Design a protein with these regions (language model features):
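RNA-recognition motif
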Residues: 2, 32-41, 79, 123-133
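Conserved short N-terminal element of RNA/RNP-binding modules in eukaryotic RBPs
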Residues: 1-17, 41-42, 87-107
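Acidic (E/D-rich), amphipathic helical modules within compact regulatory domains
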Residues: 31-78
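Low-complexity RS/RG/RGG-rich segments used by eukaryotic RNA-binding proteins and nuclear co-regulators
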Residues: 63-92, 155-183
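Short alpha-helical elements within RNA-binding folds
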Residues: 10-30, 101-121, 152
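Eukaryotic short linear interaction motifs
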Residues: 17-19, 33, 42-45, 52-54, ...
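Conserved RNP beta-strands of RNA recognition motif
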Residues: 10-13, 26, 42-57, 74, ...
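Ankyrin-repeat TPLH-centered helix-turn motif and closely related helix/turn capping elements
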Residues: 109, 113-176
Length: 186
């Protein structure tokens, strides 16, 4: 496989900005991983697909995105190929950065999920839907989510819950943005 441009460089990042705030601006398609480097005021977002990365890169360059009133600089990271284990898990198990938890007890809170699961790797977002006893935990990488999905069901304290992959929140492209993307790529 030939390495392709699927990693986008985000410069001029505010040092206090969180991954969640950055990813709230990125609704183009599934992401493999996100690396924040606050000491260098930048981040790298690796999409699963080069076309999605190109759409984000082009649209962000045109519409000029900003975070905490700072205009972000958009560029390219090093071309790369997704690791084969991740490609396989995405194709055969619908792996994503998002892990779904079902049949949760009433004592499970957003804080307990965050503290229990952060040992696997950095977390983007935790969304607990109490009425349905479910939660979605978005990690910064598919690799971390894969570790959670394969490890936790074996653990006695987690085996009573349903654990699987959910849809990456960045894969949801709002209708208005779909039209903009279609227009920009004609």
């Amino acid at each position: 496989m030939v390495p392709v441009g699927r990693t986008v460089y985000i410069g001029n990042m505010p040092p206090e900005a969180s991954a969640e705030e950055l990813l709230d601006l990125v609704h183009y398609g599934p992401i493999e991983n996100v690396r924040l480097l606050p000491e260098k005021a930048c981040a790298f977002i690796s999409f699963l697909c080069g076309q999605v990365a190109a759409a984000f890169h082009a649209d962000s360059s045109v519409r000029r995105i900003s975070l905490h009133n700072r205009e972000l600089k958009i560029g390219w990271g090093k071309p790369s190929v997704p690791p084969p284990a991740i490609v396989y898990a995405v194709q055969h198990q619908q792996a994503s950065r998002n892990v779904y938890f079902g049949q949760l007890d009433e004592h499970v809170t957003e804080e307990t999920l965050r503290s229990s699961l952060s040992k696997f790797g950095p977390i983007d977002q935790v969304k607990l839907i109490r009425e349905q006893n479910i939660a979605f935990v978005h990690f910064l990488s598919i690799q971390t989510a894969m570790k959670v999905v394969t490890t936790l069901p074996m653990s006695p304290e987690w085996s009573k819950y349903r654990i699987n992959y959910g849809k990456d929140r960045c894969a949801y492209v709002p209708k208005g943005q779909q039209q903009i993307q279609a227009h920009n790529h004609q």
